[in-house]
């Protein structure tokens, strides 16, 4: 898994928090990355209809629908995120050994199941849920700063 899913979730939560169009540079500063990377990650979110884009001086990105309707699964699917990805599996399909010739396929099935489980879990969490969790945590830990 690369960081695109986390970056996308961060950007969407910040857009929910600010409730306005924000340019990639402002998002990048808050995410602690560069604007080019933000634009790269935001493109598939726009294609999936999760965000709206606007050009011009008041342009940037905004949520295309309420944050409570955007699940983390939708974000993962838009960004093409694979949570468990293994570049190598043991064994060799050409070996004359039951274990060696089967191990790769069995392990790949297990990893595919883990990815399905991740997506199923993410279906139950929305961008708004994360915004609320952050707000509640900030208020509990620093009530003077976040009344």
Would you name each region that the model predicts?
Residues 1-33, 52:
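N-terminal helix-turn-helix DNA-binding core of bacterial DNA-binding proteins
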Residues 36:
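Key DNA-contact positions within bacterial/archaeal DNA-binding proteins
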Residues 41-48:
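Basic amphipathic alpha-helical segments that dock to polyanions
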Residues 67-92, 107-112:
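Conserved segment of winged-helix/HTH DNA-binding domains
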Residues 91-147:
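C-terminal regulatory/oligomerization modules of transcriptional regulators
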């Amino acid at each position: 898994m690369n960081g695109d899913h986390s970056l996308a979730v961060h950007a969407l939560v910040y857009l929910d928090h600010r409730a306005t169009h924000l340019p990639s540079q402002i998002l990048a500063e808050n995410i602690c990355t560069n604007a080019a990377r933000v634009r790269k990650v935001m493109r598939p979110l726009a294609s999936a209809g999760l965000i709206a884009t606007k050009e011009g001086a008041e342009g940037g990105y905004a949520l295309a629908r309420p944050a409570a309707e955007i699940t983390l699964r939708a974000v993962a699917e838009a960004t093409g995120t694979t949570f468990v990805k293994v570049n190598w599996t043991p064994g060799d399909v050409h070996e004359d050994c039951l274990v060696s010739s089967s191990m790769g396929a069995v392990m790949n099935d297990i990893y595919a199941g883990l990815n399905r489980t991740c997506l199923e879990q993410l279906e139950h969490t929305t961008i708004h849920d994360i915004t609320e969790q952050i707000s509640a945590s900030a208020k509990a830990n620093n009530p003077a700063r976040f009344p």
